[in-house]
Amino acid sequence: MRFEDIGISKVDKVCLVDRLGCQENLVGTVHVTTTHIIFRAENGSKELWLATGLISSVEKGTLTAAGCMLVIRCKHFQVITLLISRDKSCQDLYETLQRAAKPVSVNVTELLAFENREPVEDVRGWRRLDWNSEMTRQGITKSQWTESNINEGYTICDTYPNKLWFPTAASTSVLLGSCKFRSRGRLPVLTYFHQQTEAALCRCAQPLTGFSARCVEDEKLMELVGKANTNSDNLFLVDTRPRVNAMVNKVQGKGFEDERNYSNMRFHFFDIENIHVMRASQARLLDAVTKCRDVTEYWKTLEASGWLKHVRSVVECSLFLAESISRGTSCVVHCSDGWDRTSQVVALCQLLLDPYYRTIHGFQVLIEKDWLGFGHKFDDRCGHVGALNDEAGKEVSPIFTQWLDCIWQIMQQKPRAFQFNERYLIEMHEHVYSCQFGTFIGNCDKDRRDLNLSKRTKSLWTWMDARHDDYMNPFYSPTAHVALLDLDTRAARFTVWTAMYNRFDNGLQPRERLEDLTMAAMEHVGVLESHVAQLRTRLAELKTQQNQQITSTNTPTNMVDSGMSSATDDLKNLSLSHPLDPLSSTLPILERATSQESGVMDSSLYYPDEALTKYSLKWQPLRGADRCSNPACRGEFSSTIERRIHCHLCGMIFCRRCLKVSADERERVCDKCKTD
């Protein structure tokens, strides 16, 4: 948001209303900057920051005796309700927030990501995908598929990457002819090669057939795609649109392929609706999860939204593709322009087939390849910049959100197949819209290069790499699943993703997340086991020193044995005990034992109590931990998705800002423990 768009920069005596009535309302001040909306409570108990790019809509209520209500709905599904006593202040703030939600400027360089004042040296983040390395990893047979420089400099298709792979037998004239016959020049190209069956997954846009047009070069290219598979030359062409929609496009000179003109090809339609239907569907879904007050109304609104039906359609189409490729049949997929529904099903199909894409790093590579590389229009679909007219505003649609929802549905059935957890998906979704990073800015790869984003903005991947442990799934087993082809696609298996759509609705008794409880327990056990290992090491040192003293001083054996037996036996008992057993009863024994001896013990063998009591046996529970334990911070955890992190020494919960990682990256300690 530009400085001149700020009509009012500060509003006092604003009441932050808890719409669920679970917490007390807070009086404070609202500050408006070019990048954030900030609410700070007068008593200092709460400070809420909201990036202006996350504002979706603003609603102003009627003036009452108490004041005027202002409801801010966000793209990451937070709902903020403000009660402002003065109507003039409310109107000024409303108009300011409206300009943030619907920016007048169409200049993408005014986004938050470009406000970065630090020098950008983010090579790893901006080079997450290396096309040649990825195709080599897939095991492409160069005798059948080859890299082409036909789109070098984005000359034939500006929404495709400049590196493309085609059947080796395809000539340049065939490629150019097919390019002219496909919408937006998006001809069939390889995106995934299944090494076990040599089946290929290709993507493209709809053909410009109209009612009778055909293209010999396009037909030849499709034939070569089928023949590139030495195990089967059959080819499935999957149109993700409803058949009636494809028929309507014929009137516009577009449409779908005539099966009679393509040899060895079978046609399949899948009824995945367009961006306008999905936008309306999500709006009804949000009405159900945020506005409905009784169960009957909730279920009626949810059913009317059709959201779960649409999610199911995407999963079913992706599963069909995965099953076909695993059986050895190559597939070509398109929708209208090949950057919305095609990106959804092609990427989800690869996720089902290849366990690499179900890792944290591999998932980022998949997004870079099939969403960013092949031109999903993130600027338009996410509404990053203002629209020149109302028609351009209708380009906004939750296509990427829906794809993440599909992945979450699969995670519920296969919880051990994914290295990452749902926090990974939710935080990624937030930053797709926040525009804090440059990764998801631009409509295609060419846009991002023209904007020089790698030099001017930071990569989301680097930011997430620094929080890698936040996204680990404690139940992940790399060998548990290879291909996920046994999904249950019955309607009852698809449910509302409440952690996403009700992320900020904590309620009276917010539940701890099972993943977080498990991770905290595993981390605690790991810390204690590490401490036990240190004690065992110290025990070995004591034994070594004992033997050295025997040799050097020629002390009678019975005196040494009597002097050391008490200490070493206690350490043995301690090292063999369970890491979670209380150690308080055994901790003082070493000091007592050594102090009672008659001068035989060397001072270097003394092992003080503070070394044994370094780690807390009892950690602060996650339940009720809604604030950082640092008295100077007391930062609030606004939702259960925000990770509560334990100090390895005192066991208290802190926010990430108040914890420091040791030099060897083995310990995480708070400022107080670090000082002590």
Swiss-Prot record:
Does this UniProt record's set of keywords contain Kinase? Answer: no
Residues at which substrate binds: 249-252, 274-275, 335-341, 381
Q: Kindly state the tissue distribution recorded for this protein.
A: Expressed in intestinal cells. Expressed in head neurons, pre-anal ganglion, hypodermal cells, anal depressor muscle and non-neuronal cells in the tail.
Q: Which residues form the Myotubularin phosphatase domain?
A: 125-501
Q: Which UniProt keywords apply?
A: Cell membrane, Cytoplasm, Endocytosis, Hydrolase, Lipid metabolism, Membrane, Metal-binding, Zinc, Zinc-finger
Regarding the membrane, this protein is recorded as:
Peripheral membrane protein
Where does it reside? Cytoplasm; Membrane; Apical cell membrane
InterPro entries xrefs: Myotubularin, Myotubularin-like_Pase_dom, PH-like_dom_sf, Prot-tyrosine_phosphatase-like, Tyr_Pase_AS, Tyr_Pase_cat, Znf_FYVE, Znf_FYVE_PHD
Show the catalytic activity: a 1,2-diacyl-sn-glycero-3-phospho-(1D-myo-inositol-3,5-bisphosphate) + H2O = a 1,2-diacyl-sn-glycero-3-phospho-(1D-myo-inositol-5-phosphate) + phosphate; a 1,2-diacyl-sn-glycero-3-phospho-(1D-myo-inositol-3-phosphate) + H2O = a 1,2-diacyl-sn-glycero-3-phospho-(1D-myo-inositol) + phosphate; 1,2-dioctanoyl-sn-glycero-3-phospho-(1D-myo-inositol-3,5-bisphosphate) + H2O = 1,2-dioctanoyl-sn-glycero-3-phospho-(1D-myo-inositol-5-phosphate) + phosphate; 1,2-dioctanoyl-sn-glycero-3-phospho-(1-D-myo-inositol-3-phosphate) + H2O = 1,2-dioctanoyl-sn-glycero-3-phospho-(1D-myo-inositol) + phosphate
Q: Residues in the active site?
A: 335
Subunit structure as annotated in this protein's UniProt entry? Heterodimer with mtm-9.
Q: What does this protein do?
A: In association with mtm-9, plays a role in endosome trafficking probably by regulating phosphatidylinositol-3-phosphate levels. Regulates fluid phase endocytosis in coelomocytes. Controls the endosomal localization of sorting nexin snx-3 and the levels of sorting receptor mig-14.
Q: What is this protein called?
A: Phosphatidylinositol-3,5-bisphosphate 3-phosphatase MTMR6
